Amino acid sequence: MSDVEALVAATNKEFGRIDILVNNAGTMPASPIIDRRISDWKHMVDVNVNGVLHGIGAVLPTMLGQGSGHIVMIGSIAGRRPFPGGTVYAATKFAVRALSWGLHLELGAAHGIRVTDIQPGQVATELYEGVRQGPYKDAWDKAWEGKRRLKPQDVADTVLFAVTSPEHMVVSELLVRPLDQAN
């Protein structure tokens, strides 16, 4: 049993149901695509795509059985628009967008499971250390010098907004970014 499956089993045992999954998985070791850092690519796909799939797979039997639930996928603005050095990362976050839409089509009306894809821009977390340690460090630091980023609480508040919407509706996508983020 995986850690995710164990967590779902413990939650089911304690509460008898799973109402919400916040599916947040991400790593971003940025590098130019021509560097061919294939092990980094594989790791990003494993964490950013397969990690999300494992979360879905773990809660799905419970949500299907109870005829309700809400899966919140934490994607990225990069899933809409790649950036230099982040091509593979952007591809993984585009996969999260595609999964979200597909889940909505398969699980929404037929099974009462809502799906929301939240796509944050820059959030002040350790995720960006992968960029800051790579060949883009100086450009990244200069681009963000003196600028405000989202706080993790901003993303949490966005999740709360989505999951507290009326049961008859679904907030399908939310793009949130700092005011200081141009793209």
Task: Locate the predicted segments by residue.
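The beta1-alpha1 cofactor-binding region of Rossmann-like NAD(H)/NADP(H)-dependent oxidoreductases
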Residues: M1-A6, I38
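Substrate-binding pocket helix/loop in short-chain dehydrogenase/reductase
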Residues: P32-I33, D40-K42
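Active-site loop immediately N-terminal to the catalytic Tyr-X3-Lys motif
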Residues: I34, R81-T87
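Active-site helix of classical SDR
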Residues: I56, T92
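Residue(s) in the substrate-gating loop at a strand-loop-helix junction
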Residues: S76
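Active-site-adjacent segment of SDR/Rossmann-fold oxidoreductases
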Residues: R81, G102-I113
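C-terminal helical subdomain
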Residues: I113, D117-G121, D138-N183
